[in-house]
Design a protein with these regions (language model features):
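Bacterial N-terminal signal peptides
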Residues: 8-15
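Short, polar/charged alpha-helical segment
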Residues: 32-54
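Positively charged n-region of N-terminal signal peptides that target proteins for export
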Residues: 1-4
Length: 144
């Protein structure tokens, strides 16, 4: 849990400076209790440290999100959203709906001092055409 919270805090802090003010829109389907609590803690901490930024969270149920993402990315894209890596994100990358975040992967000042080393196992699924299109925030083991 501590690693998730540190990761979330770092992700929210990336790309924001004291000159940024306004609303940060986040679309997600993280409704499970532990991740939801970690995100809420990180959002509250971020807002304490950035009073000029308001976080607007649009939380969808898991199945509804799978349909909604196709609509909101083309009509009213959020600043931040979560999705699957690899082939699941490929259509959105090809359509130009996802921002290249390779610069964050090459930054050595993230959480444990080196995102590339600390999350090297997640880099390949996030890489399309030699660029990274996402930042991992958690890890789920789906099989044994």
């Amino acid at each position: 849990m501590k690693k998730i919270i540190a990761t979330l805090t770092a992700i929210l802090a990336m790309g924001f400076s004291s000159s940024f003010a306004g609303t940060l829109v986040i679309n997600t389907d993280l409704t499970d209790p532990a991740p939801k609590a970690a995100f809420e803690w990180a959002f509250n901490k971020f807002q304490e440290e950035n009073p000029d930024v308001t976080i607007e969270v649009n939380n969808f149920d898991h199945e509804g999100y799978k349909q909604a993402i196709r609509n909101f990315l083309t009509t009213s894209p959020p600043d931040v959203f979560n999705w699957y890596a690899g082939n699941r994100m490929l259509p959105f990358v090809r359509a130009g709906l996802v921002e290249d975040v390779s610069d964050i992967w090459s930054d050595t000042g993230w959480v444990d001092g080196n995102l590339t080393e600390g999350m090297s196992h997640a880099k390949k699924p996030m890489t399309i055409g030699g660029k990274q299109w996402g930042i991992p925030y958690t890890y789920y083991q789906w099989g044994v």
